[in-house]
């Protein structure tokens, strides 16, 4: 037998096997394709139902072919309180059968895959306005890939749009959203937006975000339907907020970079929630204020009670006074001794301004307030301040330049004088401790005793102490 004949025979056999595999996989892929929509509906219903919206994928239809299938489906958005408000987003596309989908094979991608799909938004009465502002590009295209372990990703591409009316203009740049999923449903979402701009028609206000990125990873908690664990973050590059006042002066706030991190962890019947905010290169009218790093934590939150509180909140149709049952629920929540921590720090070229507040609630019995026993409400209470004097002067100088519109040299002299004057009395009274280039304050509840900088003080003096400390640090 000639080698060429043998080669052709092998190719033909492989081709037949591929086509046969694609035909068989097509049936399995179609079933899994529909199943993924069922899982998606469960995920989005859980997310939107508490917010008073109904969102679901419906009218899923498949026309099977040899190597691919034609698909159609609708995404329907309803407001249960407004039956006339129904928005239907129709999609059409192609489901490519594995194990080697045609669209992957054409790109020399030989990774075995159960299916890939490519779907595009279809123009109708609801979407026609979206097509117009997308300027010829399909407003929304969706690409999905799933492997034989039933894991994969859905990538959504939103075309840039410009939306204008009599009051304002919006520009949303190129946007991409990726949803990673497992057999249990969506587990992580990643989003990028190259630019978002808002501008008022009279041009008195303009806000621009550049290079927006976000990630959300979560695990639902079966017994607490409105809660989940996991990490989320959102970040952006240079952000500008420009506003013109009634006198015609334009103020420009610029943040070079910013990021917000969130993290929720379950510890048996309780949840710990943490947040971090970073603002880098903050300027107002080109006057530098430094970098802000803010850490917050809400720990030891009773999951069952918190879930009930959220249900009660979402059930409200308007702002109404708390019912007796809701007040009792909140008191029960605080009786579980939740903890709150707040740690801001501002870093400037001259130094740092830092504070620590750490409070754990002991009881919800507010009757102790009428007896003047404020700190009996707390399991522990910590309030600390640690600041560089030079940093205080630098921040005060920046505020002076903006409020009084003076040159930096004059603002520096005025700021130094005012800071020194404001610190004098609290230092003399022992509220603040002078450590040369630094000042500090330690107010700690320890073994039932309230200590200021290591010395026990009467509880009734706390309000005046905190007031004087705030006044001295405020400038």
Regions found by a protein language model. Name each.
Residues 5-9, 16-475:
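Glycine-rich, small/hydroxylated-residue low-complexity segments
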């Amino acid at each position: 037998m000639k080698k060429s004949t043998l080669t052709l025979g092998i190719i033909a056999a492989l081709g037949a096997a591929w086509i046969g595999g694609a035909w068989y996989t097509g049936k399995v892929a179609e079933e899994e394709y529909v199943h993924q929509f069922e899982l998606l509906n469960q995920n989005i219903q859980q997310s939107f139902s508490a917010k008073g919206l109904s969102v679901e994928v419906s009218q899923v239809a498949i026309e099977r072919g040899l190597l691919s299938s034609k698909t159609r489906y609708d995404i329907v958005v309803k407001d249960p309180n407004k039956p006339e408000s129904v928005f239907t987003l129709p999609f059409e596309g192609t489901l490519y059968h594995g194990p080697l989908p045609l669209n992957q094979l054409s790109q020399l991608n030989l990774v075995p895959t159960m299916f890939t799909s490519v779907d595009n938004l279809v123009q109708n009465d609801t979407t026609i306005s979206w097509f117009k502002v997308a300027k010829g590009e399909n407003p929304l295209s969706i690409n999905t890939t799933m492997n034989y372990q039933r894991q994969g990703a859905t990538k959504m591409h939103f075309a840039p749009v410009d939306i204008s009316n009599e009051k304002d203009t919006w520009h949303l740049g190129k946007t991409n959203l990726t949803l990673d999923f497992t057999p249990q449903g969506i587990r992580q979402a990643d989003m990028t937006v190259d630019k978002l701009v808002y501008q008022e028609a009279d041009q008195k206000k303009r806000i621009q975000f550049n290079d927006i990125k976000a990630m959300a990873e979560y695990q639902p908690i079966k017994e607490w339907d409105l809660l989940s664990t996991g990490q989320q973050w959102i970040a952006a590059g240079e952000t500008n907020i420009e506003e013109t006042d009634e006198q015609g002066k334009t103020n420009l706030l610029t943040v070079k970079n910013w990021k917000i991190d969130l993290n929720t962890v379950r510890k048996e019947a309780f949840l710990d929630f943490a947040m971090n905010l970073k603002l880098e290169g903050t300027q107002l009218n080109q006057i530098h204020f430094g970098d802000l790093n803010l850490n917050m934590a809400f720990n030891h939150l009773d999951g069952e009670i918190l879930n009930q509180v959220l249900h009660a909140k979402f059930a409200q149709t308007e702002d109404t006074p708390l019912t007796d049952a809701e007040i009792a629920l909140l008191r029960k929540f605080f009786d579980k001794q939740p903890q709150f921590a707040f740690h801001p720090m501002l870093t400037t070229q001259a130094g740092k301004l830092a504070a620590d507040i750490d409070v754990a609630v002991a009881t919800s019995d507010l009757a102790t307030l009428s007896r003047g026993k404020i700190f009996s409400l707390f399991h522990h209470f910590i309030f600390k301040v640690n600041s560089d004097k030079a940093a205080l002067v630098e921040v005060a100088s920046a505020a002076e330049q903006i409020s009084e519109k003076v040159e930096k040299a004059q603002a520096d002299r005025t700021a130094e004088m005012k800071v020194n004057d404001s610190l004098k009395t609290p230092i003399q009274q022992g509220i603040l401790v002078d450590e040369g280039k630094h000042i500090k304050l330690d107010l700690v509840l320890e073994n039932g005793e309230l200590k200021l900088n290591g010395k026990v003080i009467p509880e009734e003096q706390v309000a005046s102490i905190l007031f004087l400390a705030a006044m001295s640090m405020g400038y």
